[in-house]
């Protein structure tokens, strides 16, 4: 028997019972050797606890999509959504049935007007989150709109088997160390 559809917010806020039911939703088969949360943590390079929190935020986001108008996810929540879509039987079956409607994920059309629209929509999502759930979203999973969209054009998928990632700060420190180390060696051998 299918679970009941989650109710709409009452006086702008989700009911305690519906919030509990929302967070009780499980994704994927529970008897698998690798749970949804474990797969998410592995694929994203996250700690398992962070992945579990990201899934809870994704569930809240999905609820907002149904009850608070067009919403835009944080990068982390979007990664949960992408993985959930690969669990298609679960996604298009029990999950959307519980939400009470289908929830589609579409790409941007691109361009400056779309960037502006999605940034404003994301800010509205943060405001709706605070209103519906009675508290602001956690900043480590839902950064402010300006911060969330500042890094977006610079993000890339990277195959860590082929590439090593080093921060620019670390590279600058290594470069400075090599430069000053070279000066010290040159000075000690009388080259300067």
Give, region by region, the residue ranges found by the protein language model.
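Acidic, Ser/Thr/Pro-rich intrinsically disordered cytosolic tails and loops
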Residues: 2-192
